[in-house]
Curated annotation (Swiss-Prot):
SUPFAM superfamilies per record: Glucocorticoid receptor-like (DNA-binding domain) (SSF57716)
This protein's encoding gene: yacG
InterPro entries: DNA_gyrase_inhibitor_YacG, Znf_NHR/GATA
Cofactor annotation remark: Binds 1 zinc ion.
Reported cofactor(s): Zn(2+)
Protein name: DNA gyrase inhibitor YacG
Gene3D superfamilies noted in UniProt: Erythroid Transcription Factor GATA-1, subunit A
Function (record text): Inhibits all the catalytic activities of DNA gyrase by preventing its interaction with DNA. Acts by binding directly to the C-terminal domain of GyrB, which probably disrupts DNA binding by the gyrase.
Binding partners and assembly: Interacts with GyrB.
Family, per entry: Belongs to the DNA gyrase inhibitor YacG family.
Amino acid sequence: MNAITTIKCPQCRKETTLAGNPYRPFCSQRCKMIDLGTWADEGYRIPGEKAPESGDEEPGDE
């Protein structure tokens, strides 16, 4: 049984295959680049404490 695995593109939600897809998990280069641009523009954020600004001392540095 050789079932073809399909997933939804995280950007446009279009169904796409994993096997042989050079842009996976995206359906196309366009969706991949849109996602990369969102990361570059800091549109996505990982939860946590804000990082210290450059020039600020680290906690414990005195």
